[in-house]
Every structure is written in structure tokens, then in C-alpha cells.
Curated annotation (Swiss-Prot):
Coiled coil: none annotated. Keywords: Cleavage on pair of basic residues, Disulfide bond, Knottin, Neurotoxin, Secreted, Signal, Toxin. Residues 1-22 form the signal peptide. The keyword ATP-binding does not apply. Expressed by the venom duct. This is Turripeptide VI/VII-01. GO terms for cellular component: extracellular region.
């Protein structure tokens, strides 16, 4: 009975630690993704010349200006 109690407690502790580690990894992944999106916005902004003054997309090297960053626009296929 005592051994069963020890094994149960050990199992519960290890499963809790696994969930906690998974949550930590997920949180780090989400923060990394946010940092990457911000970095991509900065790179697009700097490389394409998108600025606060002109948000109509004329100054982008491709695509359109959105949130002060240049983004590619998908071309629509023309129907024949």
C-alpha cells in the first residue's frame, strides 16, 4: 500500500512537471513568433521604403503598405 502511494505521488509530480514544461515551451515559442513578426515588419519597412507619411502603397517595392510595413499582394488569375 505504501509503495503504491509513493508511485502515485511520483506519477502525479512527473506529469505536472511535464505540463509545466510544455507550457513554458509554448510560451517561449509564442514570444519568439511575436518577435519574428516584429522583425519582419521592420525589415519590410526598411527594405521597401514604407513610411508613416505614405500609406497608400505607392512607395512599396512590392505589394501594399499596411501598418507601416510592405506586404506582398496575391495576384488574381485573370479569367479567359
Amino acid at each position: 500500500m505504501r509503495l503504491q502511494l509513493i508511485l502515485t505521488i511520483t506519477l502525479l509530480l512527473t506529469s505536472f512537471m511535464g505540463y509545466r514544461d510544455a507550457a513554458v515551451i509554448q510560451g517561449k515559442t509564442e514570444r519568439s513568433a511575436m518577435k519574428m513578426r516584429k522583425l519582419l515588419q521592420i525589415l519590410h519597412k526598411n527594405s521597401c521604403g514604407c513610411n508613416d507619411d505614405d500609406s497608400d502603397g505607392d512607395d512599396c517595392c512590392f505589394g501594399t503598405c499596411l501598418d507601416n510595413a510592405c506586404w506582398p499582394v496575391k495576384k488574381r488569375s485573370s479569367a479567359i
